[in-house]
Amino acid sequence: MDVQMKRGLLDVCVLAAIKNEDSYGYKIIKDMKPYVELSESTLYTILKRLETANMLTVRTAEHGGRLRKYYRITEEGNKRIEDFKAEWREILSIYRFVIKEDSDND
């Protein structure tokens, strides 16, 4: 898979993982595990990129005597998810056309 495409997919997956509630690194990895395997280093690179792009915010809170970073999706992050859905609806339409053409030639 193209590196840029994979990056975009992973960014949206991380945004989707925090869409309904604030979350922290380990929980994001755990929530995504049934769908995609993600290392901690990759996740934190993505989180930093999304924060820089104003798609999420970060707050620090104490949990069990330790500081933990919690991530919250922003309006811009929600917009990215909606844009992604629209893009993929178009891609699926093209895919169906290609598959139809293949099956017509069989």
Predicted regions and their residues:
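Short, motif-level signal for alpha-helix interfacial/capping segments enriched in acidic residues
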Residues: 17, 52-53
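N-terminal helix-turn-helix DNA-binding core of bacterial DNA-binding proteins
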Residues: 2-42
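Beta-hairpin "wing" of winged helix-turn-helix
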Residues: 53-67, 72
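Amphipathic alpha-helical dimerization/coiled-coil segments
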Residues: 82-106
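Short, hydrophobic-biased segments on the C-terminal half of alpha helices
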Residues: 47-49
